[in-house]
UniProtKB/Swiss-Prot annotation:
The keyword Transferase does not apply. Residues 1-21 are annotated as: Disordered. It is found in: Plastid, Chloroplast. Coiled coil: none annotated. It comes from the Eukaryota. This is Large ribosomal subunit protein uL16c. It comes from Amborella trichopoda.
Length: 135
């Protein structure tokens, strides 16, 4: 699972996901990509599940790039705990995704293979996505 080696602060505010992605919204490395259409938090487990699904389908063919990294810690309070006594402890990591963001890229495979692999990866994501190709 992906997570930062170290961070300046252990806990973060939740923040808001408004607007569209201004960075990371163009294909840079591969020829085909999976683009987010909705805002969401995507966990490191979901990113890894998508990457594995694509790798398994492509079967050593082509190359896959993961364009998102989970750098936001999400805290969870223990079950049956009274209110107060501070914020919970960091439980897992998420990546803040805005519409337009490229999640995965793929190259070195035919479009049919890339499209099918990304469809499987899209099923692992909690948001609607679209398949795009470089001009």
């Amino acid at each position: 699972m992906l997570s930062p080696k170290r961070t300046r602060f252990r806990k973060q505010h939740r923040g808001r996901m408004k607007g569209v992605s201004s960075r990371g919204n163009h294909i840079c490395f591969g020829r085909y990509a999976l683009q987010a259409l909705e805002p969401a938090w995507i966990t490191s487990r979901q990113i890894e599940a998508g990457r594995r699904a694509m790798t398994r389908y492509a079967r050593r063919g082509g190359k896959i790039w993961v364009r998102v990294f989970p750098d936001k810690p999400i805290t969870v309070r223990p079950a049956e705990t009274r209110m107060g006594s501070g914020k919970g402890s960091p439980e897992y990591w998420v990546s803040v995704i805005k519409p337009g963001r490229i999640l995965h890229e793929m190259g070195g495979v035919p479009e049919t293979v890339a499209r099918a692999a990304m469809e499987i990866a899209a099923c692992k994501m909690p948001i609607r996505t679209q398949f795009i190709s470089a001009k």
